[in-house]
């Protein structure tokens, strides 16, 4: 027999017996009765954002700000999911995927600075995998570093080619 006081441990992906939007309604009702601001913990509000997102992906809804109790008595679960999904979708469209400069990194591999010009290729691939994991800031940082290193090694390769051609044609035979 389960103890009603202690919560049962569950898998992170499974749904709880109490739906999170219903839990939020209960918390806002308590807030209205006591006339005190009830701060939701970060883990609870994060779980609410994840569940209302409808995708179970770790996207934060930044444009929502602080949660306000709804004016209607009991909004349906589907409507709260739809509204949150619209906010998340519009936020995701505002931030475009950063460039990884993979073509530039591959082009730098043809320059004569051979072991060093693999470094921008590695950073470019790391940037692409960061985008797939959802880390846009890290992907942007790695993409910029890949671009900087690619351009640097292309310029260094051109300098090496110019020096080699100059030395080859100016040395008397």
From Swiss-Prot:
Regions crossing the membrane: 151-171
Region spans: Disordered: 1-22
RNA-binding keyword on record: no
GO cellular component: cytoplasmic vesicle membrane; endomembrane system; membrane; perinuclear region of cytoplasm; plasma membrane
Single Gene Ontology BP annotation: cellular response to insulin stimulus
Record key words, sorted: Cell membrane, Cytoplasm, Membrane, Phosphoprotein, Transmembrane, Transmembrane helix
UniProt superkingdom: Eukaryota
Induction of synthesis: Down-regulated upon cold exposure in brown adipose tissue in Zucker lean rats. Down-regulated by dexamethasone.
Segments in the Cytoplasmic topological domain: 1-102, 124-150
Entry keyword annotation includes Phosphoprotein: yes
Biased segments, Polar residues type: 1-17
Membrane topology recorded in Swiss-Prot or TrEMBL: Single-pass membrane protein
Intramembrane segments: 103-123
Main location: membrane
Extracellular side: 172-173
Record PTM Phosphoserine, positions in chain: 16, 43, 45, 70, 84-85
Subcellular location: Cell membrane; Endomembrane system; Cytoplasm, Perinuclear region
Tissue and organ expression note: Present in adipose tissue and undetectable in other tissues (at protein level).
Subunit: Interacts with SLC2A4; the interaction is required for proper SLC2A4 reacycling after insulin stimulation.
Function: Regulates insulin-mediated adipose tissue glucose uptake and transport by modulation of SLC2A4 recycling. Not required for SLC2A4 membrane fusion upon an initial stimulus, but rather is necessary for proper protein recycling during prolonged insulin stimulation.
Family per record: Belongs to the CD225/Dispanin family.
Protein name in UniProt: Trafficking regulator of GLUT4 1
The species this protein was found in: Rattus norvegicus
């Amino acid at each position: 027999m389960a103890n009603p006081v202690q919560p049962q441990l569950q898998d992170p992906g499974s749904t709880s017996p109490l739906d999170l939007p219903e839990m939020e309604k209960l918390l806002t009702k308590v807030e209205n009765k006591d006339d005190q601001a009830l701060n939701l913990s970060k883990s609870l509000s994060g779980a609410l954002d994840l569940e209302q997102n409808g995708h179970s992906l770790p996207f934060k809804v930044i444009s929502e700000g602080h949660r306000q109790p709804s004016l209607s008595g009991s909004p349906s679960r589907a409507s709260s999911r739809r509204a949150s999904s619209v906010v998340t979708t519009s936020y995701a469209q505002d931030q475009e995927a950063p460039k990884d400069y993979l073509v530039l990194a591959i082009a730098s591999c043809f320059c004569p600075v051979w072991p060093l010009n693999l470094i921008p290729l590695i950073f470019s691939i790391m940037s692409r995998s960061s985008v797939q994991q959802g880390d846009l800031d890290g992907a942007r940082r790695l993409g910029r570093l890949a671009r900087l290193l690619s351009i640097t090694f292309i310029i260094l390769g051109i300098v090496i080619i110019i020096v080699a051609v100059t030395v080859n044609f100016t040395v008397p035979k």
